[in-house]
Amino acid sequence: DPPALHVVVELTGVDPNELQLVAADRVLVVAGVRRRPPLSGRYQQMELEYGPFQRRIPLDEPVDTGAASARYELGILTVVLPIAAQAPRVERVLITIGGRL
């Protein structure tokens, strides 16, 4: 495998169809919504935040955004961004998860 940056994000309870991944200018943006499940009753402790979120992750190396891939399994998002041989021109690329938008 060529050298790559690997980004792993914990996203428990997030529907992968509600995730958007964008790589541009040495930044990976992970955005989406964690919806509150229909729960009833009283809770002593709730450790999940709900609602829209966005994370901007700086990338240490220039990456080949066109060859990026992502996998979402059991609440864990793994993004693989191959390191570019030379600095690419700045472009914004939407990364699909497991072949789905």
Residue ranges and their predicted role:
Residues 1-101:
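Alpha-crystallin/small heat shock protein
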